[in-house]
Curated annotation (Swiss-Prot):
Tissue: Mostly expressed in glandular trichomes (lupulin glands), and, to a lower extent, in cones, cones bracts, leaves, stems and roots.
Species this chain originates from: Humulus lupulus (European hop)
Effect of V139F: Higher affinity for demethylxanthohumol (DMX) and naringenin chalcone (NC). Reduced stabilization by DMX and NC
InterPro entries assigned: Chalcone_isomerase_3-sand, Chalcone_isomerase_bundle_sf, Chalcone_isomerase_sf, FAP1
Top-rank EC class of the record's enzyme: isomerase
Main subcellular location: cytoplasm
Disulfide bonds: none
EC id: 5.5.1.6
Pathway terms, separated by semicolons: Secondary metabolite biosynthesis; flavonoid biosynthesis
Protein name: Chalcone isomerase-like protein 1
A GO biological-process term: flavonoid biosynthetic process
């Protein structure tokens, strides 16, 4: 990331970056080598209050990303461009979206419903306006509604080689779906040209991280 990442996790001495609005710590590197390129927060308005639902970190295989940017873009632009973001969304590059729950009142069935609705809308935008609820429900649909989502609960949604979207909840595999459309739709939610207001800051941070790779 373009910002300094010098915090340490006292228990493991692992370098972390703190998402400032939630205080959630995200490791600078994952075990598979992906690097943290941005952090962010999902907020939702409830009864006039802004609820902090979850903090998140967006990770990428920065070596492959660097090679792709230099091949397709060449020289570093003055600021991040939509073309750069689209390369990340469309490319067969390893990505991970790490979610850490911040709201203690969240239930798994509530999360799954909101998750699938947002993903379904993103799929529809890429699919000529056609819905594909079956595809959207394949990601978290297999996860049991009985799973507890306490504050600090973690999920990881990763784009693996060959456009495979893998989802883990509490470190356990929930689904693995091979679909280029699904991969593009999922990461387009956070990096696409039209993103929710609460995701714009993390998108810009990801863009600045990409600029540092040139």
């Amino acid at each position: 990331m373009a910002t300094a990442l010098n915090s340490k996790n006292a228990s493991s001495n692992t370098a972390v970056h703190i998402e400032p609005k939630t205080g959630i710590a995200f490791p600078v590197k994952l075990d598979d080598g992906k690097s943290l390129n941005s952090v962010g927060l999902r907020k939702k308005s409830l009864l006039g209050m802004g609820i902090k639902v979850f903090g998140f970190g967006l990770y990428a295989d920065n070596e492959k990303l660097k090679n792709l940017l230099k091949l397709k873009i060449g020289k570093s632009p003055a600021k991040p461009t939509e073309e750069m973001y689209q390369l990340v969304i469309d490319g067969d590059i390893g990505l991970t979206h790490k979610i850490v729950i911040a709201y203690s009142g969240l239930k798994m069935n509530m999360f799954k419903k909101a998750f699938s609705e947002a993903l379904g809308e993103s799929i529809m935008k890429l699919n000529g306006g056609r819905k594909n609820e079956e595809l959207a429900n394949k990601v978290l649909g297999p996860a049991s509604d009985q799973i507890k989502l306490a504050t600090g609960s973690e999920m990881e949604i990763s784009k693996l080689p060959g456009y495979v979207l893998e989802t883990k909840v509490h470190g356990e595999l929930a689904s693995r779906v091979e679909s280029e459309l699904l991969c593009r739709a999922y990461f387009g939610i956070y990096l696409g040209e039209i993103t929710m207001e609460c995701y714009k800051e993390s998108k810009e941070m990801f863009g600045q991280s990409m600029l540092s790779l040139f």
